[in-house]
């Protein structure tokens, strides 16, 4: 059996290693793992394994944070495998340096490595994957080839490569927004490609904006752990206006409101005595930007950070296409609900990577050896799409703005895979006539029980 993994972040590497361990031939397509968003992950991974903590506490926090849109079975399934995920990492020699408290969590369960967790974990996984015989091709798998609802393979530079199974682990699409903390090339191309081919997307309207982005010479995240350590959010006049440890949707929205009032928002970390020791990389970055967190306020702004929705999969990470799977941020099966809790994403990456390998091994798919059409799409005007998404499908939404965004999108000449994804977000945000988690409608500011169900997008239509 030959398996292709599209994506070289934490989810993709975990799946590749788990399959290679069973003697399966695995090829990973994508950039160097150091260029993945997983590598940029700062705070850490939520593991409810310490004395005083519990799985049920973590489950409760996740469902409460997800505004009760979560698939409860999936939440239990992922979090109950926390110990296995923890041992997967520690068995590779990875050692965590501290535990932190972050917004929405009722216990300090965020295991971190010097608050630059991704930079320590990803190289270790890549090294072990290579030692296990995983093949790495540093090229982009442009399209997925499907025939009669069965996987055929992937196109790379126009060439069709045949595989028995394809696992999409390409991350989300925060790069579809003008301001993002991730890599700007994270446009969700594989997600849009599959949407064009009839694969359903789930909860695609839920985009998480990190409350405390720093836009300087480059965009950088000031980790949630800094607020967990006692930093306060204030206006230029020194006014505190939000509970810093509220969930990200609430904090991002309140910061954005202040900015709409014409007020600057700052993070006051001057009360953290050991800032340099606890957050060495953030400290170094800020010093390079001319800011000393021991005495200066840090200007912050919300930035697109994480896409909660994605390719619709079941609890075993299967799509409706035989032999096609999706994991990590690229996928959605209801784990996060309407709002992802901080540091739950890396846990999901590990668990979904391990679980999908079990699914593939159990199902033993056989790919179709058929010809498939290659489209060779051109990028087009992606920046115009980014402007539309930021202005019309951002932190605060309303019907007129969403409809205007759709009209503007029709006129843009851009990669159809990018356009269909932007269209999906706008249409599902329009269909969800309520506010829930990361989706906030100014014209429907409250949650409505009749909308406590997932949205499903299938080629041009969003169903709720």
UniProtKB/Swiss-Prot annotation:
Disulfide bond residue pairs: none
One GO cellular component term: cytoplasm
EC number annotated for this UniProt entry: 1.4.3.16
Key words of the record: Cytoplasm, FAD, Flavoprotein, Nucleotide-binding, Oxidoreductase, Pyridine nucleotide biosynthesis
Binding site for FAD: 8-11, 37-44, 329, 345-346
Cellular location(s): Cytoplasm
Main localization category: cytoplasm
Catalytic reactions of this protein: L-aspartate + O2 = iminosuccinate + H2O2
Gene3D superfamilies the UniProt entry points to: FAD/NAD(P)-binding domain, Fumarate reductase/succinate dehydrogenase flavoprotein-like, C-terminal domain, Succinate dehydrogenase/fumarate reductase flavoprotein, catalytic domain
Cofactor binding description: Binds 1 FAD per subunit.
GO MF entry, a single one: nucleotide binding
UniProt cross-references to SUPFAM superfamilies, sorted A to Z: FAD/NAD(P)-binding domain, Succinate dehydrogenase/fumarate reductase flavoprotein C-terminal domain, Succinate dehydrogenase/fumarate reductase flavoprotein, catalytic domain
Keyword Cell division assigned: no
Known function: Catalyzes the oxidation of L-aspartate to iminoaspartate, the first step in the de novo biosynthesis of NAD(+).
Protein name per its UniProtKB record: L-aspartate oxidase
Organism this protein belongs to: Pyrococcus furiosus (strain ATCC 43587 / DSM 3638 / JCM 8422 / Vc1)
């Amino acid at each position: 059996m030959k398996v292709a993994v599209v994506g070289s972040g934490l989810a993709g590497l975990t799946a590749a290693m788990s399959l290679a361990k069973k003697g399966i031939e695995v090829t990973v397509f994508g950039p160097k793992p150091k260029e993945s968003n997983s590598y940029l992950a700062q705070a850490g991974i939520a593991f409810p394994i310490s004395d005083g903590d519990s799985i049920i506490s973590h489950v409760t926090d996740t469902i409460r944070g997800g505004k009760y849109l979560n698939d409860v079975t999936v939440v239990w399934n992922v979090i109950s495998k926390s110990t296995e995920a923890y041992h997967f990492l520690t068995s590779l020699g990875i050692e965590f340096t501290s535990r932190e408290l972050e917004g929405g969590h009722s216990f300090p369960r965020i295991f971190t490595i010097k608050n630059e967790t991704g930079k320590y974990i990803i190289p270790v996984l890549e090294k072990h994957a290579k030692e296990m015989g995983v093949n790495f091709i540093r090229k982009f798998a442009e399209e997925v080839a499907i025939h009669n609802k069965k996987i055929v393979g992937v196109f790379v530079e126009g060439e069709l490569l045949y595989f028995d199974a394809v696992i999409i682990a390409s991350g989300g699409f925060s790069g579809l927004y003008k301001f993002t903390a991730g890599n700007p090339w994270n446009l969700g191309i594989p997600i849009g490609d599959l949407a064009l081919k009839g694969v359903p997307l789930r909860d695609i309207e839920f985009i998480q904006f990190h409350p405390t982005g720093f836009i300087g010479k480059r965009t950088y995240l000031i980790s949630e752990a800094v607020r967990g350590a006692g930093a306060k959010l204030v206006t230029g006049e020194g006014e505190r206006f939000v509970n810093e440890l509220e969930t990200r949707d609430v904090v991002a929205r309140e910061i954005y409101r202040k900015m709409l009032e014409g007020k600057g928002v700052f993070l006051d970390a001057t009360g953290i005595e050991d800032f340099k020791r606890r957050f060495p990389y953030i400290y170094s970055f800020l010093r390079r930007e001319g800011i000393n967190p021991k005495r200066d306020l840090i200007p912050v702004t919300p930035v697109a950070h994480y896409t909660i929705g994605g390719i619709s999969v079941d609890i075993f990470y299967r799509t409706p296409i035989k032999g096609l799977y999706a994991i990590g941020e690229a996928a959605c099966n209801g784990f996060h609900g309407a709002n992802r809790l901080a540091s739950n994403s890396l846990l999901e990456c590990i668990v979904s990577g391990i679980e999908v390998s079990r699914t593939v091994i159990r199902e033993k798919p056989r790919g179709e050896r058929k010809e498939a059409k290659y489209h060779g799409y051109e990028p087009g005007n992606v920046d115009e799409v980014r402007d539309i998404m930021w202005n019309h499908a951002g932190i605060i939404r309303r019907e007129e703005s969403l409809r205007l965004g759709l009209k503007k999108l029709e006129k843009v000449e851009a990669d159809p895979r990018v356009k269909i994804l932007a269209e999906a977000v706008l249409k599902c945000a329009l269909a969800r006539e309520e506010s829930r988690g990361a989706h906030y409608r100014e014209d429907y500011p409250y949650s409505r029980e009749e909308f406590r169900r997932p949205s499903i997008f299938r080629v041009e239509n969003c169903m709720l």
